[in-house]
């Protein structure tokens, strides 16, 4: 009987095998019936390269189908999962210092020093760590020749913001063993460093049969504001005043400096003036929440004020990222609708504000769902997520300081006073310069300057001779070539190279360089570095070379990781789902989050003159002298992208 069924199944599926790309035959066989149907739809649309040209509603259906597939097949646990151990959420109605006890079924999920997960199985490259030479790749394909920016779409605040998020989410524990990379003779004369030393990523046995070793995250991957609060009790103690629930902040609105000359903040490693300005802004936000809560609820203890204010501030950060930063990064109507649906659901803000969370995640959004959803895989951020967030091309060579004493011109533009090299704005020297520049001038200058584009030949050369820091912000003695190091890190951490990565994300792989780009110079240089073997192409290089979707500042390959992981950061966290309520946040706290829609709202709260005098754009993340978004009378879901 089973033989007959198999024959019948093969008969039915054989026409499909001709349609489905050969690399997906095996996984298609293993899929459930629903997943098979969704895959066929997604695969057809991919073959036609159509999804981003579809009407908004159809585009959302495609993204929903693709996200479902990734939730089924691209969430892989690393390490053991406790069985039969459960904590009571009522015992921890607040975000803990080290991220523990968020998940009642797995107290360590999302905590400091938990494992990075995976979106696909690791691809061991330990015998190919230097093939091709990372310094050759960095020199011939990454190093900036002429600065290319993002036009009016994305500014330096947006570039600083993503580092602010990375310092909340991810950092790898390093080994004590050093490795040295030496420049190959063919590129040595073009490398700022002829060789450099760095610490390898520490490999830890997982005690699990499928993925035997993994890497630990020294930051808490929950969206818990750890860039300002820290990822453990020791750092948290340093940043708190223990008065009215507040955090330390200097009188000039910047981060406090300790007796050793280092900034006091939740994360002080590899910082720069743009990042610490945002850290300072959200310390102000936390402290303002404390004031509002104390006024509303004078009976609250100091610890409760801190706990509620942390919940509120973390949620504001998550909301700004979801419906403001990401919308500017992926500037299309489809993603405007998609990101707002993540927070508010398809029924929208007005409906949710009036009736509360109605329906499941699709209609009501992830925020306020009845219970968190992790699809049977403990929450973590992943190695692949880390890899697609390699975005140092966003940084220019110089910050253009604006004259805030001048009368603003058309579109609130401001004249330049001078340019300051980015090297002078990183680390301790950067903090000294920031204190001279001041918060307002720094923020306005970043607002008016476009950031770099995520393209080939746009990686800052000054970052190829960089002083890295320890976790406590102390400079290390050995300079590094960050461009070459990033290529090495992906290989060292067994992250698939570009083509295998695409297969892992159910994207059609390339078969020749011309599938990736039309640019003849890029095609020739790829051939020079990688030969004819497209399988050798490094992920970071492939994403930079890839033809971008109109309106996207990132590659489609990176975006599909975002698609699953951005949703996961909200839906797997009980403080955005079952505990997103007045009891946990307080009524005033929840109202604070629900009435904050953008970074502009946060700036307005603390520096109303900044946006009023100097910001013309709709979003604080687009260049400030750009034209505001015009009103579109066509309802969002019925819009059609320009073809």
UniProtKB/Swiss-Prot annotation:
Heme b binds at residues 172, 392, 489, 493. Binds 1 heme b (iron(II)-protoporphyrin IX) group per subunit. Binds 1 calcium ion per subunit. Its cofactor is heme b; Ca(2+). Ca(2+) binds at residues 168, 220, 222, 224, 226. GO terms for molecular function: heme binding; metal ion binding; oxidoreductase activity, acting on single donors with incorporation of molecular oxygen, incorporation of two atoms of oxygen; peroxidase activity. Its EC number is 1.13.11.92. InterPro entries: A_dioxygenase, Haem_peroxidase_animal, Haem_peroxidase_sf, Haem_peroxidase_sf_animal, Oxylipin_biosynth_metab. The keyword Secreted does not apply. Induction: Induced by the elicitor harpin (HrpN) from Erwinia amylovora and infection with E.amylovora. Induced by infection with the bacterial pathogens Pseudomonas syringae pv syringae and Pseudomonas syringae pv tabaci. Induced by salicylate (SA), wounding, jasmonate (JA), paraquat and 3-amino-1,2,4-triazole (3AT). The record marks 269 as: Transition state stabilizer. The active site is at residue 167. Gene3D superfamilies: Haem peroxidase domain superfamily, animal type. It is an enzyme of class 1 (oxidoreductase). Keywords: Calcium, Dioxygenase, Fatty acid biosynthesis, Fatty acid metabolism, Heme, Iron, Lipid biosynthesis, Lipid metabolism, Metal-binding, Oxidoreductase, Oxylipin biosynthesis, Peroxidase, Plant defense. PANTHER family: ALPHA-DIOXYGENASE 1, PROSTAGLANDIN G/H SYNTHASE. Alpha-dioxygenase that catalyzes the primary oxygenation step of a variety of 14-20 carbon fatty acids, containing up to three unsaturated bonds, into their corresponding 2R-hydroperoxides. Involved in the production of oxylipins that function in cell signaling, wound healing, and protection from infection. Belongs to the peroxidase family. This is Alpha-dioxygenase PIOX. It comes from Nicotiana tabacum (Common tobacco). The gene is PIOX.
